[in-house]
Amino acid sequence: MHKVYLKPGKEESLKRFHPWIFSGAISRFDGEPEEGEVVEVYTSKKEFIAEGHFQIGSIAVRVLSFRQEPINHDFWKRKLEIAYDMRCAIGIAINPVNDTYRLVHGEGDNLPGLVIDIYAKTAVMQAHSAGMHVDRMVIAEALSEVMGDKIENIYYKSETTLPFKADLFPENGFLKGGSNDNIAQEYGLKFHVDWLKGQKTGFFVDQRENRSLLERYAKDRSVLNMFCCTGCFSFYAMRGGAKLVHSVDSSAKAIDLTNKNVELNFPGDPRHEAFAEDAFKYLDRMGDQYDLIILDPPAFAKHKDALRNALQGYRKLNAKAFEKIKPGGILFTFSCSQVVTKDNFRTAVFTAAAMSGRSVRILHQLTQPADHPVNIYHPEGEYLKGLVLYVE
């Protein structure tokens, strides 16, 4: 195993159990580790401090353990058992009306670079680091042992998620099984999961609790679901008793999937219509007929150099919603950009509210659900921000 030596003083963040080692903190390497290899990390005084996956780029090492231990099948199995036991403890993995949840959430489960989502009998595994890609087969074997007959398929979906500097060429495909049965259930509602071509692992698991909250506010309201993607906010609103629900997305494919999902749950229901159209153009044209609006756009910024434009985008989008929503309306507004902080997002929304001149009150401050835990030593893991606002 190759060794990495840090510059003097650069071990302090590791002493606080932060799971990332940046390339600028490294003094030298003992040898030439390969991309994705497990390396041992030492202080400038040659004291062991951690071990983890190495890769070329800004984050040079993602820590797997703060003690010396073999990173082998037993290691992965133990980590996956811990993750599964937590999901059972919070009730999400053993809920009879829900078979959709996140089993592994990267740094939140002390497995930086790895995401595993469960959809009924299929686990979708995604690598966000070179090391997790290199170790994918042993991880899949351990996952199969931990989950037993609870899963029949493991699909690997990492063609677009590895860092661009990684000299790797992952291919999507089944590591176990091969079933095309892609219907899963969330709190009694059914939906199609497109793990072959869909975004993320095929579905946005992280909005489950926020969708459930929306259901409580939907009765007798006219609902607009912007950036609808799979349409899940829409059919939660329908179950909640909305009098009409309109779903909007610029992607015709997203609209097709939304219509399929609505039909799966509410066949022939005339309350729902879907439109393939730009969000801003639709709000300008039709926005003043709604008293419940959901703004759940894709990430406006994935890197810090895009932050300024992202905040302008959030201000513009929310300002248009404040301008159009009916008096007494409720606005659910979100940001899933990790580089946009909670304060950044609130400031953008508050500025938009002030521009509208309307009285606005916060009803809820939202975040990601419990199966997307945040490692207390890695606050960067809190990426989903949301507000529920009452607009007079």
Task: Give a label for each model feature.
Residues D220-C229:
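Conserved class I S-adenosyl-L-methionine
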Residues Y290-K320:
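Mobile active-site "lid"/loop adjacent to the S-adenosyl-L-methionine
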Residues L244-D249:
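Conserved SAM-binding motif I beta-strand of class I
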Residues I330-E392:
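C-terminal catalytic and target-recognition region of SAM-dependent MTase-like enzymes
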Residues V104-D117, H133-F204, S212:
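Non-catalytic substrate-recognition/targeting regions of SAM-dependent transferases
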Residues T230-K243:
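Conserved SAM-binding loop of SAM-dependent methyltransferases across substrates and taxa
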Residues M1-I118:
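Non-catalytic accessory regions of SAM-dependent methyltransferases
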Residues K253-I294:
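S-adenosyl-L-methionine
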